[in-house]
Design a protein with these regions (language model features):
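Short periplasmic/luminal acceptor-recognition loop of GT-C membrane glycosyltransferases, typified by
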Residues: 425-468, 496-506, 541
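Transmembrane-helix signature of polytopic, membrane-embedded enzymes
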Residues: 84-85, 101-125, 142, 156-162, ...
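Hydrophobic, aromatic-rich transmembrane alpha-helices
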Residues: 94-98, 198, 279-322, 333
């Protein structure tokens, strides 16, 4: 056992590390939003809602059909004119999840393990990345963690209904945050009757009650999620649009979208079958930011190693703890497999398993530390303590190294100190920003811009932007008999200006069009577009 004085010193050390980590994330966040999803969705759609005076359908933005519980919160900082605050709103959900982990581990192990669990969670690279950007994933992490922990408490407290209600409400909030919450709903709806029936295996009445509790959980969760379902059904005839649209609207079936995730990876990255099948393990070791081939994010490899040690010495654990470890482990494994088979893997898609894996990892470390036999000498105990200490230090070192890399990449001090202005900072990461700012300052309020290969990043535009639809634009060019007809078709959609990303547009046109289409497109660009401004590989044109 650790001496009380040593434990107090370790507690203080971990608290200092926690405060340093939180301060670092706060500094990293204090720059203008430049992440892709923020500019296409999480800030762009709330801004449009604010300008419109309420929620309305935006057919050109597929993201606008997603559930938006957290996105609606971002309307508050946008209304106040400070979009940086949206990052701190998102970070709050990470802090709340860290508190949940701390509270659970404090009750199950001790204060020292609880502090380490919170520190480990908040410093994991993908959590840091999400904390300093405007996403919604940390909201999903928080609500799914609340849901599963209160499900465990429901069993612990003799199945008092209030804990099941809290779990179901949290699952409903998770659904309203991101569609990945559907996996949480499916798994926990199955877990509810399973957990209850394990206590009353020989009673027919209890089996009916187990089914009742599962149905009750499902009903409460879907009730909270229902406003988003109803909205989408009214607009698109598909409550989960754009998911499963081939079921609800078979006429809209896209052959490309029907390609499975395994085939996609084979086509895009030339991966072998073994490489693809090993993705559930590879994500813990090979993750890279901004690289879809390597899952667009980073985890800590120990999250897939240490949880297995949580099962060591199970016979000495209370039956309640054994059950909770199994449930947390089952949730993490099943969620990971569902995400793996359903779509091309991104680490952001599996964030709900991170809190359970952190809890299991801390249990694993605790088991390694406490593992002992009577014949073990004092020297072996010291070796075991040294091993745990080395593991803890190495885990935190991996996370700390990532945070240092973020300071280099984000460069917050240059902006905070005033050496770099807001527009200059944004333009460094989003080269189309200069063209968008020119349009904001020089185009009339009723201008309508077609954005072509600007990545749908329209948040910083104060003019209406209609985003480029590849299939529709190609169909328009294919059906045009002349450059004049192409101009007519574009103006007929109310388009007055175009913003074009040159490199991607040229590559796309050369690959997709034949001689006739290229001639029409060339005449259109030469005779019916007037270049107003160009910078950073992007140009603003006026239709003439």
């Amino acid at each position: 056992m650790i001496k009380p004085s040593t434990q107090a010193a370790l507690n203080i050390t971990l608290i200092i590390f926690l405060l340093a980590l939180i301060s670092s994330i706060a500094i990293l966040s204090y720059v203008p939003p430049v992440s892709k999803d923020a500019l296409t969705h999480h800030l762009a759609v709330p801004k449009l809602y604010l300008n419109h005076g309420g929620i309305y359908e935006i057919p050109s933005l597929e993201f606008s059909y997603y559930p938006m519980n957290i996105d609606l919160l971002y309307m508050i900082p946008l209304y106040l004119g400070n979009d940086i605050l949206a990052k701190y709103i998102h970070f709050i959900f990470a802090l709340l999840t860290g508190w949940l982990i701390f509270d659970y581990l404090k009750r199950k192990i001790n204060n020292l393990s609880a502090l380490f669990g919170a520190l480990l969670f908040l410093s994991i690279p993908i959590i840091v990345k999400l904390s300093v950007n405007v996403y919604v994933d940390l909201g999903l992490v928080f609500f799914s963690t609340v849901s599963i922990l209160f499900l465990l408490k429901w069993a612990e407290k003799d199945f008092q209904l209030k804990y099941l209600i809290i779990s179901a409400l949290s699952c409903g909030f998770a659904l309203g945050t991101k569609y990945n919450g559907l996996i949480v709903l499916f798994l926990l709806t199955l877990f509810v009757p399973f957990i209850y029936s394990r206590y009353f295996q020989n009673s027919t009445r209890s089996q009916y009650r187990a089914i009742y509790y599962g149905a009750f959980f499902l009903f409460i969760s879907l009730l909270l999620f229902s406003p988003w379902l109803i909205k989408n059904f009214i607009w698109t005839n598909n409550p989960l649009y754009p998911l499963f649209d081939n079921w609800f609207n078979p006429a809209n079936l896209d052959s490309i979208s029907s390609i499975g995730p395994f085939a996609q990876r084979r086509m895009l990255y030339q991966e072998s079958l073994w490489e693809t099948l090993l993705i559930p393990l590879r994500i813990f070791f090979q993750g890279q930011d901004n690289n879809p081939r390597y899952f667009d994010g980073k985890l800590n490899p120990f999250l897939v190693i240490l949880p297995f040690f949580a099962f060591c010495g199970r016979k000495n654990d209370p039956s309640e703890l054994q059950r909770e470890i199994k449930i947390l482990f089952a949730f993490a494994i099943l969620f990971l497999l569902f995400a793996f088979f359903m779509r091309d893997m991104r680490i952001r898609y599996i964030t709900p398993i991170i809190a359970p894996l952190v809890i299991l990892s801390v249990f694993g470390l605790d088991k390694i530390y406490r593992f002992e036999k009577k014949e073990y000498s004092e020297t072996s105990k010291k070796i075991r303590i040294g091993l745990v200490s080395m593991l803890v230090c190495f885990m935190l070192f991996l996370n700390a190294r990532y945070i240092v890399e973020q300071f280099r990449y984000i460069a917050p001090l240059s902006y905070i100190s005033g050496r770099v202005g807001r527009d200059e900072y944004i333009e460094k990461y989003r080269p189309e920003h200069a063209v968008i700012q020119y349009a904001n300052k020089n185009l009339s309020d009723n201008a309508r811009i077609l954005g072509i290969f600007i990545g749908n990043r329209g948040y910083y535009s104060d003019r209406e932007v209609v985003f480029f639809n590849i299939k529709l634009f190609r169909k328009t060019i294919d059906s045009a008999v002349s450059a004049e007809r192409l101009l007519y078709d574009i103006k007929n959609k109310g388009i007055s200006h175009l913003i074009i990303g040159f490199d991607l547009f040229n590559e796309w046109a050369n690959i997709n069009f034949g001689k006739r289409e290229k001639e029409i497109l060339g005449n259109f660009l030469k005779n019916h577009l007037h270049l107003l401004f160009s910078k950073g590989g992007y140009g603003l044109y006026k239709c003439i």
